[in-house]
Amino acid sequence: MADKEIATLRDALRGTKFVYIAASFAALGGLLFGYDTGVISGALIFIKREFGLTTVAEEIVVSGVLLGATLGAIVGGKAADLFGGRRVLLVTAAIFGIGALASAVAPSPPVLIVSRVVLGLAIGLASTNVPVYLSEVAPPHARGWIVSLFQLAVTVGIVVAYLTDYAFAGVEGWRWMLGFAVAPALVFGTGMFFLPETPRWLIRGGHHDVAHRVLVRIRELGDVNAEIEEIKASLAQQTEGGHWTDLLRRQVRPALVVGLGLAVFQQVTGINTVIYYAPKILQTAGFNSASGAILATVGVGVVNVGMTIVAMFLVDRAGRRPLLLVGIAGMIITLGALGLSFRYPSGQLAWIAVICLMGYVASFAISLGPIFWLLIAEIYPLRIRGVAEGTAATFNWASNLIVSLTFLTLVEKLGASSTFFLYGLASVASWLFAYYFVPETKGRTLEQIEAFWRARHRARQRASWR
């Protein structure tokens, strides 16, 4: 494509719609995240049949993505600080396509596992960079729901994966299930090619004129000097950062505790056991056919999407903390009910397990699901935002890996009922953590949130001097 044609297309994206177009393309990284994590739930039934996998081998196939995602999260934040989120997301799109294609043609379990590790690398890069990109192009009054587009896209990707699983279940077409992700990867990469870097990254790199032009485009304001000065002032109040050791500084530590705590609790409350193993869970509950279990899983996925949309509309109205506390309370109740439903599994009562799963997923979708990704994109100082979010995402993926590697084994040793009771206890701990440690960020600019942490640090210093 000629430079003139590229410039014309970029110019066509000017105006009020530009920020929403940019957010939609960036959020495709979330859709691929959701698809590539969710698709294995239905495909695994047929992969096990073809390759004769043991329980441990099944856990490794599922968790290959999570190992790659952990590695991607480790490098993703620092890479964005150095090269910019847009460039990193372009590379991410290419890795998504390569990983999906390699998974679809894998001739053996080892090749499939390696291919899923590659896919996981892309997922880890997307999970660290898409929320930050969205938070930095969004206006403060709409940042909550725009960043929540990422989680919405994840849930849509999961539903698309479940529908694809159901479509190919009749022919046991697990290769088609895995290979379908190549198409959205191409769209994601094409969209990111035409999007700009974020103003904050550009100003940090000294590209002030480019940052001014980008802000004028995404804010539809002739005068964006006030916002530019606010970003500059935020940078001026910090020493050089962006290194891992900066995360241990006293003024950063409270935000780090919030981010890492939410990262771990989002996973140890068990949500991805439902995403990865839902058909197997439902077969344990009494569903006899693979197709029936997969179809019921689609219903769970639709609830996930619907409640994520509800969260998007409420997050900038009700605030982050109220949604978090109410949603986690719902998770505690539904996990308890789910544990009880597995005490007495039968075909007649199988739908009780489905209803409990839907209630659990609905509660997660208005709380830990979107709000974790939103908060870790908001709460960190600008200079370390990339590396800090990368660290939080790394903890998130490492926790996900541990939970997913142990779920089937826990069910074998303890039973499904006790396993879900265990996740319920973790949810109680997460509610207490949210109540005592998580601040409200609704309606604040990123610079105001940063100032809040500085003021809190100074107040603690003064208290310690008395």
Where are these regions (language model features)?
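Alpha-helical transmembrane bundle of multi-pass membrane proteins
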Residues: 1-210, 214-216, 236-466
